[in-house]
Amino acid sequence: MTDFVAHRNGRPATAEELAPLAFAGYAHFTAMQVRGRRVRGLDLHLERLRYASIELFGRALPDDRVRDYLRAAVAAGPADVSLTATIYSPAGEFTVAGADVEPEVLVRTGPAASGPTGPLALAT
C-alpha cells in the first residue's frame, strides 16, 4: 500500500482542520516533484513561498520550519511523489486578521507525475 499524506504544520491534518481552508481561498502555494526524497531547486521553492507570504500576509514562516514540514510529509510516503505546499491564513479571506495571526502550512503528497516523453510544440 502506498501512503500519501495531507499534513498541517508538520502533522497529519484532520477534516475539521482542512474544511476552513477549502472555503477560505486566502493562500498561495508551490508544487514540486520529489524523486528519491529529494527536490531540485528546493531553495527556489522556499524563496517563492517566503516572498509570497510577505506579500500576502506581511510576514513569512522561517525556511527551516517550512523545510521541516516538507520533510515530515516526504518521510511519511514513498520516495517519489508530487508535493504541493500551501501557505494560508487560518483566519480566512473574509475576516480581519491581526498581525498576530501566523500563516499555517498544508503539505499534500500524491502520485509522482512524469513529464511528456517527447518534445512539445506550441500551436498558434
Regions found by a protein language model. Give the residues of each.
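Conserved alpha/beta cores of soluble small-molecule-handling proteins
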Residues: 1-124
